[in-house]
From Swiss-Prot:
Part of the beta sliding clamp loading complex, which hydrolyzes ATP to load the beta clamp onto primed DNA to form the DNA replication pre-initiation complex. DNA polymerase III is a complex, multichain enzyme responsible for most of the replicative synthesis in bacteria. This DNA polymerase also exhibits 3'-5' exonuclease activity. The delta subunit is the wrench that will open the beta subunit dimer. It comes from Bacillus subtilis (strain 168). GO terms for cellular component: cytoplasm; DNA polymerase III complex; nucleoid. Disruption phenotype: Essential, it cannot be disrupted. Belongs to the DNA polymerase HolA subunit family. Component of the DNA clamp loading complex consisting of tau(3):delta(1):delta'(1). The DNA polymerase III holoenzyme complex contains at least 10 different subunits organized into 3 functionally essential subassemblies: the Pol III core, the beta sliding clamp processivity factor and the clamp-loading complex. The Pol III core (subunits alpha, epsilon and theta) contains the polymerase and the 3'-5' exonuclease proofreading activities. The polymerase is tethered to the template via the dimeric beta sliding clamp processivity factor. Pfam families: DNA_pol3_delta, DNA_pol3_delta_C. The lineage of its organism: Bacteria, Bacillati, Bacillota, Bacilli, Bacillales. It catalyses: DNA(n) + a 2'-deoxyribonucleoside 5'-triphosphate = DNA(n+1) + diphosphate. This is DNA polymerase III subunit delta. The gene is holA. It is found in: Cytoplasm, Nucleoid. One of its GO terms (biological process) is DNA-templated DNA replication. Its EC number is 2.7.7.7. SUPFAM superfamilies: P-loop containing nucleoside triphosphate hydrolases, post-AAA+ oligomerization domain-like. GO terms for molecular function: DNA binding; DNA-directed DNA polymerase activity.
Amino acid sequence: MVFDVWKSLKKGEVHPVYCLYGKETYLLQETVSRIRQTVVDQETKDFNLSVFDLEEDPLDQAIADAETFPFMGERRLVIVKNPYFLTGEKKKEKIEHNVSALESYIQSPAPYTVFVLLAPYEKLDERKKLTKALKKHAFMMEAKELNAKETTDFTVNLAKTEQKTIGTEAAEHLVLLVNGHLSSIFQEIQKLCTFIGDREEITLDDVKMLVARSLEQNIFELINKIVNRKRTESLQIFYDLLKQNEEPIKIMALISNQFRLILQTKYFAEQGYGQKQIASNLKVHPFRVKLAMDQARLFSEEELRLIIEQLAVMDYEMKTGKKDKQLLLELFLLQLLKRNEKNDPHY
Protein backbone atom coordinates (compact mmCIF):
# COMPACT_ATOMS: atom_id res chain seq x y z
CA MET A 1 0.00 0.00 0.00
CA VAL A 2 2.63 2.55 1.07
CA PHE A 3 4.79 1.76 -1.97
CA ASP A 4 1.78 2.35 -4.25
CA VAL A 5 1.37 5.80 -2.67
CA TRP A 6 5.06 6.60 -3.11
CA LYS A 7 4.98 5.37 -6.72
CA SER A 8 2.00 7.62 -7.52
CA LEU A 9 3.70 10.61 -5.91
CA LYS A 10 6.85 9.97 -7.95
CA LYS A 11 4.65 10.27 -11.06
CA GLY A 12 3.26 13.57 -9.74
CA GLU A 13 -0.16 12.09 -8.94
CA VAL A 14 -1.77 13.55 -5.81
CA HIS A 15 -5.15 13.44 -4.09
CA PRO A 16 -6.95 16.53 -2.75
CA VAL A 17 -7.37 15.00 0.73
CA TYR A 18 -5.19 12.42 2.50
CA CYS A 19 -5.75 10.75 5.85
CA LEU A 20 -2.54 9.08 7.00
CA TYR A 21 -2.91 7.08 10.21
CA GLY A 22 -1.10 4.40 12.21
CA LYS A 23 1.71 3.93 14.72
CA GLU A 24 4.67 3.47 12.35
CA THR A 25 6.16 6.97 12.62
CA TYR A 26 8.71 6.53 9.83
CA LEU A 27 6.09 5.59 7.22
CA LEU A 28 3.95 8.58 8.20
CA GLN A 29 6.83 11.05 8.13
CA GLU A 30 8.32 9.71 4.90
CA THR A 31 4.94 9.83 3.13
CA VAL A 32 4.34 13.43 4.26
CA SER A 33 7.85 14.33 3.08
CA ARG A 34 7.17 12.83 -0.36
CA ILE A 35 3.83 14.63 -0.63
CA ARG A 36 5.60 17.89 0.23
CA GLN A 37 8.30 17.32 -2.41
CA THR A 38 5.63 16.62 -5.03
CA VAL A 39 3.20 19.44 -4.19
CA VAL A 40 5.27 22.44 -3.11
CA ASP A 41 8.26 24.02 -4.86
CA GLN A 42 11.28 24.75 -2.68
CA GLU A 43 11.10 28.42 -3.74
CA THR A 44 7.45 28.90 -2.70
CA LYS A 45 7.17 26.62 0.35
CA ASP A 46 7.27 29.60 2.74
CA PHE A 47 4.07 30.87 1.12
CA ASN A 48 2.24 27.66 0.22
CA LEU A 49 3.03 25.20 3.02
CA SER A 50 1.14 25.36 6.32
CA VAL A 51 1.36 22.99 9.28
CA PHE A 52 -1.24 22.95 12.07
CA ASP A 53 -1.25 21.01 15.34
CA LEU A 54 -4.84 20.50 16.49
CA GLU A 55 -3.72 20.21 20.09
CA GLU A 56 -2.77 23.89 19.84
CA ASP A 57 -4.35 25.35 16.67
CA PRO A 58 -8.05 25.68 15.75
CA LEU A 59 -9.30 23.49 12.90
CA ASP A 60 -11.10 26.48 11.34
CA GLN A 61 -7.73 28.13 10.77
CA ALA A 62 -6.44 25.11 8.83
CA ILE A 63 -9.58 24.98 6.67
CA ALA A 64 -9.41 28.72 5.98
CA ASP A 65 -5.80 28.28 4.89
CA ALA A 66 -6.78 25.38 2.61
CA GLU A 67 -9.35 27.62 0.92
CA THR A 68 -6.81 30.39 0.29
CA PHE A 69 -5.35 30.56 -3.23
CA PRO A 70 -1.66 29.62 -3.50
CA PHE A 71 0.83 32.46 -3.87
CA MET A 72 3.37 32.32 -6.72
CA GLY A 73 2.68 28.62 -7.23
CA GLU A 74 0.10 26.17 -8.55
CA ARG A 75 -0.77 24.37 -5.33
CA ARG A 76 -0.98 24.81 -1.60
CA LEU A 77 -0.20 22.08 0.97
CA VAL A 78 -1.92 22.05 4.36
CA ILE A 79 -0.74 19.48 6.92
CA VAL A 80 -2.98 18.95 9.95
CA LYS A 81 -1.40 16.99 12.81
CA ASN A 82 -3.04 15.19 15.75
CA PRO A 83 -6.74 15.11 14.74
CA TYR A 84 -7.55 13.26 17.98
CA PHE A 85 -11.30 13.64 17.39
CA LEU A 86 -10.98 10.82 14.81
CA THR A 87 -10.38 8.35 17.64
CA GLY A 88 -12.58 7.14 20.47
CA GLU A 89 -10.21 8.74 22.97
CA LYS A 90 -11.81 11.04 25.53
CA LYS A 91 -9.58 13.97 26.37
CA LYS A 92 -9.93 17.45 27.74
CA GLU A 93 -9.77 19.80 24.77
CA LYS A 94 -7.77 23.00 24.93
CA ILE A 95 -9.58 24.17 21.80
CA GLU A 96 -13.08 23.44 20.55
CA HIS A 97 -12.88 22.28 16.94
CA ASN A 98 -15.54 22.77 14.26
CA VAL A 99 -15.57 19.17 13.01
CA SER A 100 -18.64 19.73 10.81
CA ALA A 101 -16.64 22.31 8.81
CA LEU A 102 -14.05 19.61 8.07
CA GLU A 103 -16.80 17.21 6.98
CA SER A 104 -18.02 19.84 4.52
CA TYR A 105 -14.51 20.60 3.26
CA ILE A 106 -13.52 17.00 2.46
CA GLN A 107 -16.71 16.56 0.41
CA SER A 108 -15.79 19.58 -1.71
CA PRO A 109 -12.07 20.31 -1.29
CA ALA A 110 -10.31 23.28 -2.88
CA PRO A 111 -8.92 22.12 -6.27
CA TYR A 112 -5.63 23.96 -5.71
CA THR A 113 -4.91 22.50 -2.24
CA VAL A 114 -3.63 19.16 -0.97
CA PHE A 115 -4.99 18.67 2.55
CA VAL A 116 -3.24 16.07 4.74
CA LEU A 117 -4.60 14.76 8.04
CA LEU A 118 -1.73 13.18 9.97
CA ALA A 119 -3.19 10.87 12.64
CA PRO A 120 -0.53 8.88 14.58
CA TYR A 121 -3.10 6.54 16.12
CA GLU A 122 -3.43 2.77 15.84
CA LYS A 123 -7.14 2.94 14.98
CA LEU A 124 -9.74 5.49 13.97
CA ASP A 125 -13.26 5.40 15.38
CA GLU A 126 -15.24 3.84 12.52
CA ARG A 127 -18.55 4.88 14.13
CA LYS A 128 -17.89 8.58 13.76
CA LYS A 129 -19.53 10.51 10.94
CA LEU A 130 -16.24 12.23 10.07
CA THR A 131 -14.35 8.92 9.79
CA LYS A 132 -17.04 7.58 7.46
CA ALA A 133 -16.82 10.75 5.35
CA LEU A 134 -13.04 10.43 5.13
CA LYS A 135 -13.28 6.78 4.02
CA LYS A 136 -15.67 7.87 1.30
CA HIS A 137 -13.99 11.05 0.05
CA ALA A 138 -10.32 11.00 1.14
CA PHE A 139 -7.33 8.82 0.30
CA MET A 140 -6.72 6.64 3.37
CA MET A 141 -3.31 5.16 4.15
CA GLU A 142 -2.60 3.00 7.20
CA ALA A 143 0.98 3.02 8.52
CA LYS A 144 0.87 0.04 10.85
CA GLU A 145 3.85 -1.28 12.76
CA LEU A 146 5.44 -4.13 10.83
CA ASN A 147 6.31 -7.58 12.15
CA ALA A 148 9.60 -9.29 11.26
CA LYS A 149 8.39 -10.79 7.95
CA GLU A 150 6.68 -7.54 6.90
CA THR A 151 9.87 -5.61 7.69
CA THR A 152 11.87 -7.97 5.48
CA ASP A 153 9.28 -7.59 2.69
CA PHE A 154 9.45 -3.80 3.15
CA THR A 155 13.24 -3.96 2.68
CA VAL A 156 12.90 -6.03 -0.52
CA ASN A 157 10.29 -3.63 -1.93
CA LEU A 158 12.32 -0.58 -0.93
CA ALA A 159 15.23 -1.89 -3.01
CA LYS A 160 12.84 -2.35 -5.96
CA THR A 161 11.88 1.35 -5.81
CA GLU A 162 15.57 2.05 -6.51
CA GLN A 163 15.55 -0.45 -9.43
CA LYS A 164 17.65 -2.87 -7.39
CA THR A 165 17.04 -6.33 -5.91
CA ILE A 166 17.95 -7.80 -2.55
CA GLY A 167 17.47 -11.46 -1.61
CA THR A 168 15.52 -12.57 1.45
CA GLU A 169 18.64 -13.66 3.37
CA ALA A 170 20.42 -10.35 2.74
CA ALA A 171 17.26 -8.39 3.61
CA GLU A 172 16.79 -10.34 6.85
CA HIS A 173 20.40 -9.71 7.83
CA LEU A 174 20.03 -5.98 7.14
CA VAL A 175 16.87 -5.85 9.25
CA LEU A 176 18.68 -7.69 12.04
CA LEU A 177 21.67 -5.31 11.98
CA VAL A 178 19.52 -2.18 12.35
CA ASN A 179 17.13 -3.74 14.87
CA GLY A 180 14.16 -3.43 12.51
CA HIS A 181 14.15 0.40 12.42
CA LEU A 182 12.59 1.46 9.11
CA SER A 183 14.38 4.82 8.95
CA SER A 184 17.73 3.02 9.29
CA ILE A 185 16.71 0.46 6.65
CA PHE A 186 15.91 3.32 4.26
CA GLN A 187 19.29 4.98 4.87
CA GLU A 188 21.20 1.72 4.49
CA ILE A 189 19.40 0.78 1.25
CA GLN A 190 20.32 4.21 -0.17
CA LYS A 191 23.96 3.65 0.85
CA LEU A 192 24.02 0.10 -0.57
CA CYS A 193 22.49 1.22 -3.87
CA THR A 194 25.18 3.88 -4.22
CA PHE A 195 27.89 1.36 -3.36
CA ILE A 196 26.89 -1.30 -5.91
CA GLY A 197 26.58 1.25 -8.73
CA ASP A 198 25.36 -0.35 -11.98
CA ARG A 199 25.12 -3.80 -10.41
CA GLU A 200 21.49 -4.89 -9.93
CA GLU A 201 21.62 -7.10 -6.82
CA ILE A 202 22.49 -6.13 -3.26
CA THR A 203 24.16 -9.26 -1.86
CA LEU A 204 24.57 -10.59 1.67
CA ASP A 205 28.30 -9.79 1.43
CA ASP A 206 27.46 -6.18 0.54
CA VAL A 207 25.28 -5.91 3.64
CA LYS A 208 27.93 -7.46 5.89
CA MET A 209 30.60 -5.15 4.50
CA LEU A 210 28.71 -1.85 4.63
CA VAL A 211 26.11 -2.01 7.39
CA ALA A 212 27.33 -1.50 10.95
CA ARG A 213 25.46 -3.09 13.84
CA SER A 214 23.53 -0.71 16.07
CA LEU A 215 24.50 -0.62 19.76
CA GLU A 216 21.23 -2.43 20.61
CA GLN A 217 22.03 -5.11 18.05
CA ASN A 218 25.54 -5.50 19.47
CA ILE A 219 23.98 -6.11 22.89
CA PHE A 220 21.59 -8.67 21.38
CA GLU A 221 24.54 -10.41 19.69
CA LEU A 222 26.53 -10.32 22.93
CA ILE A 223 23.73 -12.07 24.82
CA ASN A 224 23.24 -14.48 21.92
CA LYS A 225 26.92 -15.48 21.96
CA ILE A 226 26.80 -15.96 25.74
CA VAL A 227 23.73 -18.23 25.69
CA ASN A 228 25.33 -20.23 22.87
CA ARG A 229 28.48 -20.60 25.02
CA LYS A 230 30.78 -18.73 22.62
CA ARG A 231 33.17 -17.26 25.17
CA THR A 232 35.77 -15.74 22.79
CA GLU A 233 33.19 -14.12 20.50
CA SER A 234 31.20 -12.80 23.49
CA LEU A 235 34.21 -11.08 25.00
CA GLN A 236 35.32 -9.79 21.58
CA ILE A 237 32.00 -7.96 21.15
CA PHE A 238 32.32 -6.52 24.66
CA TYR A 239 35.89 -5.28 24.12
CA ASP A 240 34.96 -3.86 20.71
CA LEU A 241 32.21 -1.82 22.39
CA LEU A 242 34.73 -0.46 24.90
CA LYS A 243 37.10 0.44 22.03
CA GLN A 244 34.21 2.40 20.50
CA ASN A 245 34.11 4.42 23.75
CA GLU A 246 30.78 3.00 24.86
CA GLU A 247 30.40 3.56 28.60
CA PRO A 248 30.19 0.35 30.71
CA ILE A 249 27.19 1.79 32.56
CA LYS A 250 25.37 2.29 29.24
CA ILE A 251 26.25 -1.24 28.08
CA MET A 252 25.02 -2.60 31.41
CA ALA A 253 21.74 -0.64 31.12
CA LEU A 254 21.09 -2.05 27.64
CA ILE A 255 21.89 -5.60 28.79
CA SER A 256 19.48 -5.09 31.68
CA ASN A 257 16.77 -3.78 29.33
CA GLN A 258 17.21 -6.78 27.05
CA PHE A 259 16.94 -9.31 29.88
CA ARG A 260 13.82 -7.57 31.22
CA LEU A 261 12.33 -7.72 27.73
CA ILE A 262 13.22 -11.43 27.48
CA LEU A 263 11.50 -12.11 30.83
CA GLN A 264 8.37 -10.10 29.92
CA THR A 265 8.20 -11.75 26.49
CA LYS A 266 8.57 -15.20 28.04
CA TYR A 267 5.72 -14.48 30.47
CA PHE A 268 3.31 -13.26 27.79
CA ALA A 269 4.24 -16.07 25.36
CA GLU A 270 3.48 -18.64 28.06
CA GLN A 271 0.08 -16.97 28.52
CA GLY A 272 -0.64 -17.64 24.84
CA TYR A 273 0.00 -14.13 23.47
CA GLY A 274 1.32 -13.76 19.92
CA GLN A 275 4.21 -11.56 18.78
CA LYS A 276 2.01 -8.63 17.77
CA GLN A 277 0.00 -8.70 21.03
CA ILE A 278 3.19 -8.82 23.11
CA ALA A 279 4.65 -5.87 21.17
CA SER A 280 1.46 -3.88 21.75
CA ASN A 281 1.38 -4.67 25.48
CA LEU A 282 5.05 -3.85 26.01
CA LYS A 283 5.01 -0.90 23.60
CA VAL A 284 8.10 -2.09 21.74
CA HIS A 285 8.78 -2.81 18.07
CA PRO A 286 7.49 -6.27 16.96
CA PHE A 287 10.95 -7.10 15.61
CA ARG A 288 12.49 -6.70 19.09
CA VAL A 289 9.83 -9.06 20.45
CA LYS A 290 10.73 -11.69 17.84
CA LEU A 291 14.39 -11.56 18.87
CA ALA A 292 13.48 -11.70 22.57
CA MET A 293 11.17 -14.70 21.97
CA ASP A 294 14.07 -16.59 20.38
CA GLN A 295 16.29 -15.89 23.39
CA ALA A 296 13.55 -16.54 25.96
CA ARG A 297 13.53 -20.24 25.01
CA LEU A 298 17.10 -20.56 26.31
CA PHE A 299 16.36 -19.40 29.88
CA SER A 300 14.10 -20.48 32.70
CA GLU A 301 12.06 -17.77 34.43
CA GLU A 302 14.09 -18.32 37.61
CA GLU A 303 17.38 -17.77 35.74
CA LEU A 304 16.11 -14.56 34.18
CA ARG A 305 14.94 -13.15 37.52
CA LEU A 306 18.31 -13.95 39.10
CA ILE A 307 20.20 -12.25 36.25
CA ILE A 308 18.01 -9.14 36.53
CA GLU A 309 18.65 -9.01 40.30
CA GLN A 310 22.41 -9.23 39.69
CA LEU A 311 22.19 -6.41 37.15
CA ALA A 312 20.30 -4.24 39.65
CA VAL A 313 23.07 -4.78 42.24
CA MET A 314 25.71 -3.99 39.61
CA ASP A 315 23.84 -0.82 38.62
CA TYR A 316 23.98 0.37 42.24
CA GLU A 317 27.69 -0.46 42.57
CA MET A 318 28.51 1.35 39.32
CA LYS A 319 26.55 4.47 40.25
CA THR A 320 28.01 4.67 43.76
CA GLY A 321 31.53 4.20 42.41
CA LYS A 322 32.31 1.37 44.83
CA LYS A 323 33.99 -0.77 42.17
CA ASP A 324 35.55 -0.32 38.74
CA LYS A 325 32.74 -0.24 36.14
CA GLN A 326 34.57 -2.21 33.44
CA LEU A 327 35.71 -4.87 35.90
CA LEU A 328 32.17 -5.28 37.26
CA LEU A 329 30.79 -5.82 33.78
CA GLU A 330 33.57 -8.24 32.80
CA LEU A 331 32.97 -10.35 35.91
CA PHE A 332 29.23 -10.40 35.25
CA LEU A 333 29.72 -11.58 31.66
CA LEU A 334 32.20 -14.27 32.74
CA GLN A 335 29.76 -15.52 35.41
CA LEU A 336 27.00 -15.63 32.80
CA LEU A 337 29.23 -17.60 30.45
CA LYS A 338 30.16 -20.00 33.25
CA ARG A 339 26.48 -20.59 34.12
CA ASN A 340 25.65 -21.41 30.51
CA GLU A 341 28.64 -23.74 30.20
CA LYS A 342 27.40 -25.63 33.26
CA ASN A 343 23.95 -25.88 31.70
CA ASP A 344 25.46 -27.34 28.52
CA PRO A 345 24.77 -31.11 28.45
CA HIS A 346 28.08 -31.57 26.57
CA TYR A 347 30.08 -29.56 29.12
